[in-house]
Amino acid sequence: MSHSVKIYDTCIGCTQCVRACPTDVLEMIPWDGCKAKQIASAPRTEDCVGCKRCESACPTDFLSVRVSLWNETTRSMGLAY
């Protein structure tokens, strides 16, 4: 099952998330919005196993990469009352 992987523009182009991903979901692409001139991209989300190693590796204060697991979304929907 694929998960949703969102890359935010707070990415500093450090490549930590790309190196942490065991299934090569992420890659770096050119981007002029940061000093490193690159940003993480998630072209292969169907390969995401939901381990969230990319999130753990992100050094920014506000995580630049977020993984949303489909079962987390379903579970949290049942908590509203």
Swiss-Prot record:
Requisite cofactors: [4Fe-4S] cluster
Binding-site list for [4Fe-4S] cluster 2: 21, 48, 51, 54
Annotated residues for binding of [4Fe-4S] cluster 1: 11, 14, 17, 58
Listed EC numbers: 1.97.1.12
Gene Ontology cellular component list: chloroplast thylakoid membrane; photosystem I
GO BP terms: photosynthetic electron transport in photosystem I
Keywords, sorted A to Z: 4Fe-4S, Chloroplast, Electron transport, Iron, Iron-sulfur, Membrane, Metal-binding, Oxidoreductase, Photosynthesis, Photosystem I, Plastid, Repeat, Thylakoid, Transport
Cross-referenced Pfam families: Fer4_21
Protein name: Photosystem I iron-sulfur center
Membrane topology: Peripheral membrane protein
Domain 4Fe-4S ferredoxin-type, residue spans: 2-31, 39-68
Entry function: Apoprotein for the two 4Fe-4S centers FA and FB of photosystem I (PSI); essential for photochemical activity. FB is the terminal electron acceptor of PSI, donating electrons to ferredoxin. The C-terminus interacts with PsaA/B/D and helps assemble the protein into the PSI complex. Required for binding of PsaD and PsaE to PSI. PSI is a plastocyanin-ferredoxin oxidoreductase, converting photonic excitation into a charge separation, which transfers an electron from the donor P700 chlorophyll pair to the spectroscopically characterized acceptors A0, A1, FX, FA and FB in turn.
UniProt subcellular location: Plastid, Chloroplast thylakoid membrane
Gene Ontology terms, MF aspect: 4 iron, 4 sulfur cluster binding; electron transfer activity; metal ion binding; oxidoreductase activity
